[in-house]
Amino acid sequence: KEGTCQYDTYVMLAGSSFEPDTENPTYTVWGIYGGNAGGTLTGSTNVTLSGGNVRNIYGGNQEGVLTGDTHVAISGGTVQYVLGGGRSGQVNGNTSIWVTGGSVANGICGGLAEGTLGGNTSIHIENAQVESLYGGNEYS
């Protein structure tokens, strides 16, 4: 259900007890979103990963409008895709992604998968493996 929320969010995943199988991956979590499933969120989002095997990390909403900044920090674990914004919709703020360990198997986008980013993107990578890197959106 769509709604309007005003708050900051914090999501953290510290790991799992199994080894990922690259041929038939089993994910600790399929998708992590820093924001809402839909609707409007006014506030900043924070997603932290220090271990585990995650399919997708989105700093913002799955859909809808986020007014605030998004922050994604990865210090360990394995992620397939990282997007600083959301899956779709609009982010009225800045996105930042810090990867200081672990690996990103398929890519990082500073913006959204598709939608509108009304701010700046910042990506910092240190001591990590990343397949590909895009400063803006994945599609449009």
Residue ranges and their predicted role:
Residues 1-56, 62-81, 87-107, 113-132, ...:
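Surface-exposed loop/turn motifs in large extracellular/passenger domains
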